[in-house]
From Swiss-Prot:
Pathway in which the depicted protein is active: Polyol metabolism; glycerol degradation via glycerol kinase pathway; sn-glycerol 3-phosphate from glycerol: step 1/1
Gene: gk
Tagged with keyword Flavoprotein: no
GO biological process: glycerol catabolic process; glycerol metabolic process; glycerol-3-phosphate biosynthetic process; triglyceride metabolic process
Name this polypeptide is given: Probable glycerol kinase
Residues the record lists as binding substrate: 12, 86, 168, 285
Keywords: ATP-binding, Glycerol metabolism, Kinase, Nucleotide-binding, Transferase
Binding site for ATP: 16, 307, 352, 453-457
A GO term for molecular function: glycerol kinase activity
Family: Belongs to the FGGY kinase family.
Keyword ATP-binding (UniProt): yes
Organism: Dictyostelium discoideum (Social amoeba)
Swiss-Prot/TrEMBL catalytic activity: glycerol + ATP = sn-glycerol 3-phosphate + ADP + H(+)
A UniProt-annotated Pfam family: FGGY_N
Amino acid sequence: MKPYIGAIDQGTSSTRFILFDKNGDIVLSHQILLTQHHPHPGWVEHDGNEILESVNKCIQVVMKQYYENNFGTKEDIKAIGITNQRETTIVWDKKTSKPLNNAIVWCDTRTKDLVNYFNNKAKKLIDDNNIIDNNSKSTTVVDGAQGECKLESKNYLREKCGLPLSSYFSGLKLKWLFDNCESVREAYGRGDCLMGTIDSWLVWNLTGGKCHITDVTNASRTMLMNLKTLSWDKELCDFLEVPIEILPNIHSSSEIYGHVTMGDDEQQQQQHPLHGIPIAGVLGDQQAAMVGQMCFEKGQAKNTYGTGCFLLYNTGNDIVHSRNGLLTTVCYQFGKDSPPIYALEGGVAVAGSGVRWLIDNMGIAESSQEIEDLAKSVQDTGGMYFVPAFSGLFAPYWRDDARGVMVGLTHHTNRCHIARSVLESTCLQTFEVLDAMQKDSGNKLVELRVDGGMAKNNLLLQIQSDLLGLPVVKPISLETTCFGAAFAAGIATGVWKETMQFKIGGKFTPQLDENHKTQKLKEWKKAISKSLDWIDTKN
């Protein structure tokens, strides 16, 4: 049903372009896989030109089908939105629009030495100025009395940007590029260097170099934006030793930034299938999923079950600083005159990757479906637990010394119990992150909305509902990330209002009694304790 909204979903492993109708239903889509480059251990890169080519190819394929099937005219497409892999960082020459280096992907760990450097820099400033952590949940004890807790060096910038010092975020990647790439330094010296996350790179090129922008959600993942002012912060930039003048202009997540004007000359521009269409929505991928799930009320949350889990919890207009190591981020901002909505974010490192581990490493099954079937064939795990701390434990424990364990094994244990324990471990970790979010925010969760590849597993969602003691709801379409970007663009152009009916595809309600739930959580805590102190992190 006309009109239509398009959405570019530029992710870590692929690029997609999806066309939605006025009802929010998918009309057409195309996907292209991306090449990841690993020039050194721990390094992950993308070719910026390949990303652009994949976007254009997806658009061309969809638009060809659009016209061949008489869906409408170009004028029936009112806008496009963009959602993207967050934190991935690219720099380019503003005169040539050519990348000065491959994009450094969010999961790249090359900046770990910089993390140590900035931690030491922060520690000196903390010690010199005796800075206290006002958000700490623990205190030091001196002479039998509780005292104030000194700020940890990794949290030195957290009050302003909501993030700890980590190789994950864009600011350190930009610092690395300046330290290690002569082409970047030369372009900066000429006044020709621009930096951006992937959304900035796409908007710059789609508008023919007219718009150097990012939105508040992507900017909030750089460590360079002040959460209160929604602007680049000079103190943050100075601390991380990056030039503020090369950063994109920060805009809301829903407004017309520019129009598609792509091509080397006017003739090529006119021939682009989306020429003249407004670019009107930009959101980082996890925030886009929140919007796509219609999580607009304070206290609503979503979990994306993929390789790991990404959980976001809407805290409304409040900037909530976690006492459990969760991240504080911008959830969305619909229009430059609207107040921003904030969120707490937490992650589960091993979810779908735990299932892959059972298949690829342990040979327990040949497919994800077989894992689900095995898990369904038993009523419980037979008292065993799997703690997938392959690289330590994330929120709320933050223990680098932890490693994966299976505990509670007996002669009765078989591969069905192991399969079920892996699914349960994802749900137990999700419970702990959501529990921390509720404690930090002071709000009670009413239901959990879910998406991602693992959300197809109904047993997983039932277990999750049982452990949370809350309904778990999934939408009809699991393409919530793409729809979130389209929705932001649709709001900016008047296609949709700021609320839309959430289309339920499945609802799972608790079936586990409270005593069994309490016992299971108690045993999980015991299993967690067995995973600790495996690695000496001090040496």
